Structure formats: C-alpha cells, structure tokens
Amino acid sequence: MDGKQTLEQLSQKHKVSVRTVQRKLEKVGSSNLEISGKSIVIMVDAAYWGRSFGVMVFKDAYSKSVVWYKFIYRKERIIDYMEGIDYLVKNGCTIRGIVCDGMPGLIRALSCFNVQYCQFHMVKTVHSKLTKHPKSEAGKELLAISNLIAHTDKESFVGMLDQWYDVYGHYMNERSVPDQSGHTHYMHKRLRGAYLSLRRNTDYLWTWYDNIVLDIPNTNNGIESLFADLNSKLRVHNGLSLKNREKFISQYLKRKQ
C-alpha cells in the first residue's frame, strides 16, 4: 500500500473491484517476524485505536527495524511485554538495552536488562500531574526541573531535586485537618505524585549515559514516529473492518522489518 491510498483508489489503480482489494488485504498474514540472533536495543510501546484494540511493537534502535509485534484487545499488561522479550531471547537475540515508558511494574520486571525510562514520557507524566501552568511556586519550580531532564546530567538533576525538597518538602507533605474519623490526607497530592515519580525513576532516566557505549536512545521517539506514520495511513482507510485493519497493520509492520 503505497502512500495514502483509499480502497477506491487502489481498485482504480489496479482495475479491480473494491471487494477484490478487500480480499487481497485479508490474505495478508499476521505472524511473528522472522529474525536471526543479533545484538539489539529495543524501544517498546503500544498504540491504541479505541479502548479494546491496539498493537504492541518492539523496534530495534540499531537497525531501525520492527522485531516483534502483537495485537492486544484490552489494556496492555506486563506479561505481553515479557512474551515479546521471551520471543527475542529464544530466537538468539542479545538484548543490550530496553527503552520503555512508566507502566507500573514494567521496569522492575525488566530489571535484569539495561532499562532506560523514556525521558519524554517522564516529562509528560509530570505535566499531567502539575499541568503546564502550576499555581504554586513549588509546582512551578518542580515543573521547570522536570523540563531539564533531557538537558542535564544525573548528578545535577538529583542535586536540583534535593534542593527543591529542602525548600518545599514541608509544603508538599502538608496534611489536612483530621476528619470525624481521625483520618487525614495529603493537601497537595498531585505535587507529591510528580515529585515521587521523578525521585523513584531517577536511576532509570540516565541509563543511556551510564552505558554510553551501547548507544541506547534516551527517548522512545523512534517508535512514536512509527506510530504517527501508521496512523496517518490508517486515517485514509476508515472503512476497514477490525480484521482488515489488523491485516493492514501487519503488512505495514512487516515492511518495517
């Protein structure tokens, strides 16, 4: 499927009916990609169309090729990622590093590898908690620190977080007046969540630098651009059924092998 061509355009180009084009699409298989043993650094992520259909993709940062994918029909799970890892290992691949987002428990599950937390996703997580325009000075300064992740080193970043906590730690940990049951809650939950997320994942934000000879990307931009291109092609094929959409995506990803 070259460029942005609708079913009608494809039928006109090849002088066949739209139904014939659809049948051709249905013949495209959906199977694991054939790979041979090699050293790889994989960028892993999933894209969704609606709440109950998506595809998980592993892309090698060295060769820029897709090395594994899987369709999913509910929210992604750690076991899905481990299935892909197992497939690559069994096919003789040596995984030098993994770039991923902050799915709860995923980094721990992959801890036997060099795991790089996507710096872009980290900043995005902080933005989602603080918004782009926090009202408090604590929020403004923490947001500014998070925006420096891709422009500073680990030691400087940890130093900035420590200084921020020295100034705003008490404010961040303020609790409410006890209710009738004696329970209290944190007054600044989103600020606290943003800080703890940064602190908890600091060790994985500079894996690329700690293992610089492995040439691990610091973000998942390589796989995000693949999803953006795939989406642009799918938008002009809105008439595809779920089955044919899977066939289309399979063909697209196999061409990226």
Region roles according to the model:
Residues 13, 20-99, 104, 108, ...:
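RNase H-like nuclease fold core
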Residues 6, 17-20:
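Short coil turns linking two alpha-helices in DNA-binding domains
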Residues 93-103, 110, 143-257:
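Acidic/histidine-rich catalytic cores and adjacent linkers
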Residues 1-5:
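Short, amphipathic alpha-helical "recognition" segments used to contact nucleic acids or chromatin
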Residues 97-143:
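Conserved beta-strand -> loop -> alpha-helix junction used to position metal-binding or nucleic-acid-contacting
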